[in-house]
Amino acid sequence: MNVQIQSVKFDASKQFLDFSQKKMDRLDRFVDERAGDVEVVLRLDPDSEKGNKVVVISLHVPGSDIRVEERAFTFEEAIDNSMDIIKRQLEKAKAKFEK
């Protein structure tokens, strides 16, 4: 699975990019070999009470695309929360596809 990480209007540290890559690599357990690319967009939102760090993850799978947008006070927290949501959506998509 090809992972593309993009930070908007700031430079993400190598340590954080490695953290993000590791998290996205874990998705391999939940998707089959037909899954496409994963796009991760990191951006800062100055006007948010829930946190100013925004992570948008798009996963291209056969039949549909899964997109999650999560806000938090840290990018790590936003990615962790997004991963939980993506796992649930993948399970739903698998159940739907197997019917």
Residue ranges and their predicted role:
Residues 1-99:
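N-terminal, polar/charged subdomain of small-to-medium soluble alpha/beta proteins
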